[in-house]
Amino acid sequence: MAQTSTYSYTERKRIRKSFGSRDSVLKVPYLLQMQRDAYTAFLQADTAPQKRSNEGLQAAFNSAFPIVSHNGFVEMKFVEYNLAKPAFDVRECQTRGLTFASAVRAKVQLIIYDRESSTSQSKVVKEVKEQEVYMGEVPLMTDKGSFIINGTERVIVSQLHRSPGVFFEHDKGKTHSSGKLLFSARIIPYRGSWLDFEFDPKDILYFRVDRRRKMPVTILLKAIGLNPESILANFFVNDNFRLMDSGAQLEFVPERLRGEVARFDITDKAGKVIVAKDKRVTARHTRELEQSGTTHISVPEDFLIGRVVARNIVDGDTGEILAKANEELTEALLKKLRAAGVQDLQVIYTNELDQGAYISQTLRIDETVDEFAARVAIYRMMRPGEPPTEDAVQALFQRLFYNPDTYDLSRVGRMKFNAKIGRDEATGPMVLSNDDILAVVKILVDLRNGKGEVDDIDHLGNRRVRCVGELAENQYRTGLARIEKAVKERLGQAEQEPLMPHDLINSKPISAALKEFFGASQLSQFMDQTNPLAEITHKRRVSALGPGGLTRERAGFEVRDVHVTHYGRVCPIETPEGPNIGLINSLALYARLNEYGFIETPYRRVVDGKVTMEIDYLSAIEEGKYIIAQANATLDAEGRLTGDLVSAREKGESTLVSADRVQYMDVSPAQIVSVAASLVPFLEHDDANRALMGANMSRQAVPVLRPEKPMVGTGIERVAAVDSGTVVTANRGGVVDYVDATRIVVRVNDDEAVAGEVGVDIYNLIKYQRSNQNTNIHQRPIVKKGDKLAKGDVIADGASTDLGEIAIGQNMLIAFMPWNGYNFEDSILISERVVAEDRYTSIHIEELVVMARDTKLGAEEITRDIPNLSEQQLNRLDESGIIYVGAEVQPGDTLVGKVTPKGETTLTPEEKLLRAIFGEKASDVKDTSLRVDQGSQGTVIDVQVFTREGIQRDKRAQQIIDDELKRFRLDLNDQLRIVEADAFDRIEKLLTGRVANGGPQKLAKGTKIDKAYLASVEKFHWFDIRPAEEEVATQLESIKNALEQTRHSFDLAFEEKRKKLTQGDELPAGVLKMVKVYLAVKRRLQPGDKMAGRHGNKGVVSKIVPVEDMPYMADGTPADIVLNPLGVPSRMNIGQVLEVHLGWAGKGMGQRIGDMLQREAKTAELRKFLEEIYNSRGRKEDLSQLSDDEILAMARELTSGVPFASPVFDGASEEEIKDMLKLAYPDDLAQAKGLTETRTQAYLYDGRTGERFERPTTVGYMHYLKLHHLVDDKMHARSTGPYSLVTQQPLGGKAQFGGQRFGEMEVWALEAYGAAYVLQEMLTVKSDDVQGRTKVYENIVKGEHAIEAGMPESFNVLVKEIRSLGLDIELERS
């Protein structure tokens, strides 16, 4: 099926040949949709206040207001809120270390009622005061779905938590030694007390509130208003007996008798024995009894003994209670009943199998007598030690489950609750009702009786996602709740004092709650910005950890495991290795959230075996009701499922069904995996564990200097790059007017330009910006002046993108062969050419900060005047003491000069005299300058100076501000120039050929305006021309107004920018000035760096070999990387081998295209070859859309290799790869390269001897990545450094400038060698013998190389610890 849609700007330059068997039915949705939508719904900033729905901020305000005073005569009502424009934009916040946020202002009314006129029914308003009150700052989300908090980019990860509602489960027989299943139920609200019900091993049912002490469930049932009779009536059916003088008559109910063993002869009306004693009653027996018309069965006396009375039996004459409900019948009681003339007796019906007497037994151990007593018992359990007054008891019980302020089931909870207990409606009150509690107990008893099934808590229908918006709303609500208490206290004063709303509301608690959440919550994380893929994955992450979630230690295997409901919702592959495995997941490619927060995945509807284009999103619960075919099921031309049996899923199980039973079908084979996993080609051929590593390591790939598209991709590369926001896309279509390295200017198409607005889009590109991981964020334009663009076209590449596709590595020529042991155990051998060509060179940007503080001894000063430094050491600093931009610095170089006042020392008279003469002040300050760390070097690329308000700026700070303003003015002038040029072009088109009523240069009335006349008049006088047509005159006037408006807005923008730059900066307390220096460090590939492919095939560079020593092919092409073939079979990641073959084919085709271009072949020949590549196999491409020039441009782009897409689970087959290899390497070319018959292997030659290797080697191109584990960051050496305070042993780790640990095993090794002196040295002077090491320094200074080992400090610590246990221990010195 050919691609019918038109190609985008970048696709016209390079089309990726796809092997997908069919076109995607559904485009991959915008990947950051979940984050963006959730926060938009939270803020509702663009919705008019009256139209805002009750969610997010609006819901938080509605829940807190109105606040009523204790006496009820003052009330504070919420009217609406609005969000102010943020003071600084995203870039400014990042530079200045601020939070990108917007102030919330709420309009509230203070209503005071008149005490005298008001009655209890109606209140008379005395006074209303309305005012806007500041309610804290809410951080805003950037376009890329992140937040800027204190200048750093952060992500709020969504949380997967157990949905509110009711859950039934059992302990799987683990609690009791007999293995008996103990059933339990739990009602979980969104906020409020948890209510648990549980059976104990004796089958008594208990409840507990908030996991406190358990109590019999009948106490709760009595507390909600049931008496013992009604409790029994709710849970049991009755057996009706008629008492006789001896024995009784039992009302015959066939179902209850069936299956029981007769304890006596059962006879019919005629006295015929139907069932003999000790025989089991069968269906045949009950049928006989029915046919004989039996209504009652005679039973002996002992059949009644032990039965339980269903209701109170009262003596009709005296009113005395003869037997209470739930009392067991005894001989004495029967005698008493007969004596009182009781004939009809109702007892509860129970049996061992499916009608246990659990509630009856529970009622028997319950000592409470009535509703109030039951509530007192609950009060005592909740508040032990407090006196239970009647008001307190009733209030507590109401607050537990019935008060909307303290208990909220939420919409989701109510929907899940109703669904579970079998109600049809999805809505209802947000608090519990008595019926709800009763229904749950009934279901739990039914479960114990063997009816129904328990819930699976790992089912995604029972786990929901809490997004950014919901988490932020909860925090805001917390802040408002704190305010509510304070306001309530003060509202009473508003009657007497003339207080306004802002006097009553203090916004600090709100700000504190939000600040704490966005800055320090477990779910607010420092954004992983290593590359675009890391960024996008972080925002799509779903975590089960965090507040209200699980903890690593307590999470069992089941929660972490892949569940059938993960299909199409959560990726089964991408999850971290280590303690968080399975707790942190990634959203699948097409997944989205529904209104309740459950994850849904799309399916195509199938009607009578025919697959339609209708798409339904199903949640995990809905999916269980349908039979769903796989995406790769074969269809005929009409879209019908073919074959007798179709592979499908029913209730999560894979099965084969007939086509007519299928109800839905997957939309895409890639639907089950996440973005990172969907970028791994041939994922279907990799072992899951290795695929997991591959997906995770793709996120750690460092952006290299020149990104290169993957030769073998999956087709998701373009989507991921655009959605990550790293590339720049055109907001509107148009023509490129101007391009340079920092800016792209696009003149917008007339049909897309908004009337009266400037028809120009200006895109400022990011240059050398530091990411959170110190990698380089850098954008480069890929358009030329005059290029035509459509909306959404990629116009500039970012870090790790190439022509709008994610490109996290480089395509390397790989040979799978051992090479002198240098690729033993996953080591990697690399050609020197790779390093020389800077293929894996990356730029890292480090930020170094120095602050000048106000100390007790005086202010620190940033200055060039530093004591004891030579002029040579200061020659790179300017007069303000700050290094120049562009300086190349080495370890130890001074970047910013700073001096700190020292404490005054007493001076001798001579020193005083000298200081008086020479005015020397060097002795009272110490040098605390910012210097380059050991082990790092680089180029200074930027300096930022921040000065507190009221402190005078130095020259450097002023110069930075001037440069920034100059740049901004230049930007505005350019914009104005383009806007004016554009406006005058439009005017020229508008006026040419029109008749004028007059104008400049004495233009006569009725003259036709031509281009020559317009050229003779200065452009600014064109507005003075008076066209005859009214409409033209109006258009001319509107253009003039728009231009003037633009000029005015530009002047305002410049003024605002100047104001922002010249105002003082917000700095931490006590800081007067802060200087940030940015160093760019170039990191070349070197031995020790970690590298990996995309299939989990990771390794460390062991050696960089001269290119002439590398194995080479028959035509002289040397390999770039040599990998160990033993790394493939045991790891079972065969995907890498298929990638190598297909990459080899792509490279060969590129070479053939290059040859055609070199011999200047005709375009028709090129077209024919491209048709062969793109349209012989896999998805067809419509190359007729491209002009000859575009074909040539595309061919030039393809000379480096034809890129392929092998979509996940729908990739290239072996046959297709073979066909592509044959197309790429005709016989003559294959022979020249020394390829085998299959073209997948080649005979290589040893670079050192020139001899041919005995066997052919697998060669080809693989996309190989350099990971962010660079040896430069890990290398570290210590001479002397910091020691631990208690043990006096050296600290560990590079960050602490620590030493190497000489551990237990290393000690054993030295013991085994008998190296006693080395061992003594290691354990004493090189570790924690304080006197010993001081002596060693002395000896070294003296030139003596001797050690005197003493007592290790850790021994003293041990002695002290033993003494702390009360054992006296002393060291005897002999």
From Swiss-Prot:
GO cellular component labels: DNA-directed RNA polymerase complex
Organism: Acidovorax sp. (strain JS42)
Domain of life the protein comes from: Bacteria
One GO term (biological process): DNA-templated transcription
CDD domains listed in its UniProt record: RNA_pol_B_RPB2
Role according to the record: DNA-dependent RNA polymerase catalyzes the transcription of DNA into RNA using the four ribonucleoside triphosphates as substrates.
GO molecular function per UniProt: DNA binding; DNA-directed RNA polymerase activity; ribonucleoside binding
Taxonomic path: Bacteria, Pseudomonadati, Pseudomonadota, Betaproteobacteria, Burkholderiales
The UniProt record lists the keyword Nucleotidyltransferase: yes
Oligomer and partners: The RNAP catalytic core consists of 2 alpha, 1 beta, 1 beta' and 1 omega subunit. When a sigma factor is associated with the core the holoenzyme is formed, which can initiate transcription.
Encoding gene per record: rpoB
Protein name, entry field: DNA-directed RNA polymerase subunit beta
UniProt family annotation: Belongs to the RNA polymerase beta chain family.
Catalytic activity, EC: 2.7.7.6
